[in-house]
């Protein structure tokens, strides 16, 4: 087997990045918008013949030149990326791949979590990772009607609280999943704390971390899906494939979502969810958004108000628990991050 050089490619290296983009294009994929490490494999004349990337705890954007396939180069690239991740302290790794490539990654020690037929497979490098997560969830399984809510809560608003109250009133147990990945302006630890405080008056709400299995639009890999509509569709269907397994573990028969009058992405996501969930015996319940000042309450408006210091408006958008936090010295690092963020609407 030939030994070729593998090295990191930096954002400033436009020449090599252009070669990587060409190579990815030949494989029918493109460079993902979310990457924090890119490597390239070079031949003796410093031409790019292979590439792979990381983002957070995921591996992404693999390709090997067709002239070099069959030499085991992709194995070397994956091994290199796993070493990079280990050096970062990321031992539990994930990847998304085309269905036809899943067996290859299975041979490298990755195990299927869920799949969207003919589109993609979500995999991890732990044989029992998702299984252990489901068994952990099962400890909170209850009799009676169980429902679910999944929210980012970036941050927790009166709108979120209203949605939780509506859902909790309609079931015996409400399983509330907070998206745990830190792709939001408000860090996960703070988001979870504000959700916990904001639902403390509801005794039938069970709070869960989504773990690495439910991810947001912000970090879903788009590199092998042809356009934005396909990305939204792929993400929604994968999320639902994962959620259906979670629902089975917890005896969940309904999922609640907030109506989405402004975000096209979330609106399409909700539409797919309402089409697909009933096929798995799960009711999809869309709850009209709570309004303030004649407009639907949204976390993006809250972030804008936090950025500009508009506390009068914030008093109409946040529950007391969230408001008290943002007025406390503890919130200063988060507020500084929001003030320095530029555009906070789509964050």
Question: Whereabouts are the PLM-identified features?
Answer:
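Conserved GNAT acetyl-CoA-binding A-motif
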Residues: 85-98
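Conserved beta-strand in the GNAT
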Residues: 40, 46-63
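Short amphipathic alpha-helix that is part of the acyltransferase structural core
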Residues: 1-31, 42, 47
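Nucleotidyltransferase catalytic core that binds NTPs
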Residues: 97-98, 102-110, 114-347
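RNA-binding accessory domains that recognize and position tRNA/RNA substrates
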Residues: 30-31, 65-68, 83, 88, ...
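Short coil/loop residues immediately preceding or within conserved phosphate-binding loops
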Residues: 36, 59, 144
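Structural motif
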Residues: 35, 55, 116-117
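Conserved acetyl-CoA pyrophosphate-binding loop and the N-cap/start of the following alpha-helix
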Residues: 68, 72-80, 159
């Amino acid at each position: 087997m030939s030994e070729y050089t593998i090295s990191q490619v930096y954002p400033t290296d436009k020449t090599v990045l252009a070669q990587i983009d060409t190579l990815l294009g030949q494989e029918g994929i493109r460079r993902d918008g979310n990457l924090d490490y890119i490597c390239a494999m070079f031949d003796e004349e410093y031409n790019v013949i292979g590439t792979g990337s990381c983002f957070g705890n995921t591996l992404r954007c693999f390709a090997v030149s067709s002239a070099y396939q069959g030499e085991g180069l992709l194995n070397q690239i994956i091994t290199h990326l796993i070493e990079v991740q280990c050096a970062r302290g990321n031992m539990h790794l994930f990847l998304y791949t085309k269905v036809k490539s899943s067996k290859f990654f299975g041979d490298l020690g990755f195990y299927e979590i869920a799949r969207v037929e003919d589109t993609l497979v979500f995999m991890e490098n732990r044989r029992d990772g998702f299984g252990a997560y489901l068994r952990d969830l099962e400890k909170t399984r209850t009799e009676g009607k169980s429902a679910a809510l999944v929210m980012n809560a970036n941050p927790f608003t009166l709108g979120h609280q209203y949605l939780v109250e509506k859902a909790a009133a309609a079931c015996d147990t409400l399983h509330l999943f907070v998206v745990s990945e830190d792709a939001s302006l408000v860090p996960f630890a703070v988001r979870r704390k504000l959700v916990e405080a904001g639902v403390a008056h509801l005794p039938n709400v069970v709070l869960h971390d989504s773990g690495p299995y439910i991810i947001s639009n912000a970090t879903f890999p788009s590199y092998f899906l042809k356009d934005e509509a396909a990305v939204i569709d792929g993400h929604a269907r994968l999320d639902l494939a994962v959620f259906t397994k979670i629902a089975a573990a917890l005896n969940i028969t309904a999922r609640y979502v907030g109506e989405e009058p402004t975000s096209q992405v979330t609106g399409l996501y909700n539409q797919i969810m309402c089409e697909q969930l009933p096929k798995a015996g799960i009711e999809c319940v869309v709850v009209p958004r709570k309004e303030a000042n004649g407009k639907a309450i949204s976390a993006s408006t809250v972030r804008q108000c936090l950025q500009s210091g508009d506390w009068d408006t914030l008093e109409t958008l946040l529950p007391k628990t969230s408001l008290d936090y943002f007025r406390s010295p503890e919130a200063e690092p988060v507020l500084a991050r929001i003030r320095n963020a530029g555009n906070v609407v789509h964050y």
